[in-house]
Amino acid sequence: MRFLARLMAVVSFGFIAASAMASPTEPVEGAEYHRLQNAQPTDTGKKVEVLEFFWYNCPHCFAFEPSLTEWIKKRGDSIVFRRVPVGFRESFVPQQKLYYTLEAMNRMDIHKQVFDAIHVSRQKLDKEEAILDFIEKHGVDRKKFLDIYNSFGVQSKVGRVRQLQETYRIDGVPTVVIDGQYITSPSIVGSTMRGASEQAMNAATLQVMDALVAKKK
């Protein structure tokens, strides 16, 4: 029993020490980010790939979106940013297809409005018919949208997401992957910030992302 108690004390001390040394501007592996054992190749050349795994219905993704959008603008041409709509269950597929259809139609101006409709106006956009009604109200041709929504290209991208989720072991959102190797999120960063507000955790996450991008440049 004494040995077990000592072991637990050592483990606890190690965790506390790592948390104490961690900071958003100088993040510590295992505290504010995780490293994927097998780094994945990227096709972004000298630029750093940044993936954000998200779900439209997720309130934390909605809260993260404004500051993330500003961060993307600030980083400019130093990164290639890609959003990845997760598909943890079959019921997620309509919103995955919604995102990729908007992307294919070059109508990403509606992306924020989808978040607002769900989290501000309390609209349910998890079924095809509701999605079609929504995009039509925003000036998108219903038939053209539906053709792309059901296209092989969109279906292929949805299938690719399942592979990415498994590769990066995504089990929650929002989660960010830097250059196929470093994984962080407001949840991971927040584990070192007891009692911090969601806004503070989001801000700290962006600082961690800055540091990880700099590490890869």
Feature names for model-found ranges:
Residues 65-72, 95-99, 111, 128, ...:
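Extracytoplasmic/secreted envelope proteins and their assembly/folding machinery
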Residues 63, 69, 73-77, 103-107, ...:
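Sec-exported extracytoplasmic/periplasmic mature domains
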Residues 56-60, 87-91, 117-121, 153-154, ...:
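Solvent-exposed loop/turn segments at secondary-structure junctions
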Residues 4-5, 138-217:
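C-terminal cap of thioredoxin/glutaredoxin-like
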Residues 74-104, 111-136:
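Structural microenvironment flanking redox-active thiols in thiol-disulfide oxidoreductases
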Residues 46-48, 77-80, 105-111, 141-142, ...:
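Loop/turn elements at helix/coil->beta-strand transitions in domains of secreted/extracellular proteins
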Residues 2-93, 205-217:
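Extracytoplasmic thiol/disulfide redox context detector
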